[in-house]
Amino acid sequence: MEISYYEILEITQNADKETIKKAYRKMALKYHPDRNQGDKEAEDKFKLVNEAYEVLSNDEKRAIYDRYGKDALKGGGFGSSSSGFGGFEDLGDIFSSFFGEGFGSSRRRKSSNDEKIPSDFIVNLKLSFKEAVFGCKKNIDFTYKCSCKTCNGTGAKDGKLQTCPKCQGRGQVGVSQGFITFAQTCPDCQGIGEKASEKCSDCKGLGYNESKDSVELNIPEGVDTGMKLRVNAKGNILKNGTRGDMYVKIIAAEDDTFIRDDDDIYIEFPVFFTQAILGESIKVPTIRGEATLNLPKGAKDGQRFVLEKEGVKDVHSSRMGNQIVQISIKFPTSLNDEQKELLEKLSESFGIKDGMHQEQKGLFEKITNWFKS
């Protein structure tokens, strides 16, 4: 069954205009795209909320809807106006009238003095597992932007700009969704409200030129994926001549043997069943070579042991992480006659007769007595 406009706004059918307005404000805030970016369900609900309000806030449309339903509003001159809501001159005014200067028209129009380029930028640097753990030197090639001196970063010939014809100098254009129009940055002038009547021949209208450079970087020991290293004064060059920074984002490869978790290293190490039963000192690999692990008697499959300070050095201090060794007990898959005979004798020495251990026999007896009781 189709949900009614009153249910969409969570109000009763006899609600007055003020109640409808308050309900709309509440629901529009809840499902507004700016607060639910990437949420398709919220976007659909936002459209329904606007559709419901457009009808219920209009006395004529509401009367027709109450009497004949939604279908009666289709066609017949009762559709929404070309702007989504009539009577609001500036884009986003529908929201500013309800919510103040927090939505739509409150977006600051950019100034022609604003930079077309950010001062800082990020480059990705891929490292091997060992390079990230132990540090290394890397030569990084990169491209940076420099504000065009010919046009002073405007992108216009001789630096002269004219009012943007698409947004009429507002820096915003309207985009309709359902029954509402909201503002977004003008794609032609990027929100400045002005654009070049003739492009600068030097930068081709971009407002900046690109140059290539390289730098040798000392990668510290212990970096990991997602960490950023700042390289001072290697960013973009702005109109006033100041230069930003370049940030190098680390992408560290994984290893086939070792698993890294921050500064700790994990490894699964195979142990023969006799070693686990009898206990033994064994050699295990570490990121720096090998270390001795003293297995206790009766070690269990999946049991973990900590080798202190055998992990990765913390990138911000001298603290060392640990290595965690998880043992995996292995059993022989084939036996020769001598091995089979030895194991059979061992089995008998533990009291296993007729295919059953004494503990298993005791359990069966308990279950049998349970059925008899």
Curated annotation (Swiss-Prot):
Every J domain range: 4-69
Classification via InterPro entries: DnaJ (IPR012724), DnaJ_C (IPR002939), DnaJ_domain (IPR001623), DnaJ_domain_CS (IPR018253), HSP40/DnaJ_pept-bd (IPR008971), HSP_DnaJ_Cys-rich_dom (IPR001305), HSP_DnaJ_Cys-rich_dom_sf (IPR036410), J_dom_sf (IPR036869)
CDD domains attached to this UniProt entry: DnaJ, DnaJ_C, DnaJ_zf
GO CC, any one term: cytoplasm
Cellular localization per UniProt: Cytoplasm
Requisite cofactors: Zn(2+)
GO molecular-function terms, A-Z: ATP binding; heat shock protein binding; unfolded protein binding; zinc ion binding
Pfam family, one: DnaJ
Cofactor binding note: Binds 2 Zn(2+) ions per monomer.
Any one GO biological process: chaperone cofactor-dependent protein refolding
Domain remark text: The J domain is necessary and sufficient to stimulate DnaK ATPase activity. Zinc center 1 plays an important role in the autonomous, DnaK-independent chaperone activity of DnaJ. Zinc center 2 is essential for interaction with DnaK and for DnaJ activity.
Function: Participates actively in the response to hyperosmotic and heat shock by preventing the aggregation of stress-denatured proteins and by disaggregating proteins, also in an autonomous, DnaK-independent fashion. Unfolded proteins bind initially to DnaJ; upon interaction with the DnaJ-bound protein, DnaK hydrolyzes its bound ATP, resulting in the formation of a stable complex. GrpE releases ADP from DnaK; ATP binding to DnaK triggers the release of the substrate protein, thus completing the reaction cycle.
Quaternary structure and interacting proteins, as annotated: Homodimer.
Family listed: Belongs to the DnaJ family.
Name this protein carries in UniProt: Chaperone protein DnaJ
